[in-house]
Amino acid sequence: MDKIKYRPIGMKAIRLLERRQYTFDVDVKATKTEVKRWIEGFFSVKVVGMNSHRPPKKKKRMGSVIGYPVRYKRMIVTLKVGDSIPLS
């Protein structure tokens, strides 16, 4: 449960809600099986499909030092027809 960081709310995530697909940002070491078990247990829904990807790195500048923010993995979860996850 501590591996799921947050749910991004952007234009693509909102567009995916129409197709019963929910977006989660998770720890890089989290697997699809772990995330599926957690979502099915916590929200009492049935997951029928999962896709994952790692968004590209972006540079951050702090004064004269250039670095990269902490990496994460994005999971797109598809639910069974009739199931939904509350947005709040």
Swiss-Prot record:
A Gene Ontology biological process term: translation
Job of this protein: Binds to 23S rRNA.
Pfam family, one: Ribosomal_L23
Membership in a protein family: Belongs to the universal ribosomal protein uL23 family.
Name of the protein described by the UniProt record: Large ribosomal subunit protein uL23c
An example Gene Ontology CC term for this record: ribosome
UniProtKB keywords: Chloroplast, Plastid, Ribonucleoprotein, Ribosomal protein, RNA-binding, rRNA-binding
Chief location bin: plastid
InterPro entries linked: Nucleotide-bd_a/b_plait_sf, Ribosomal_uL23-like, Ribosomal_uL23/eL15/eS24_sf
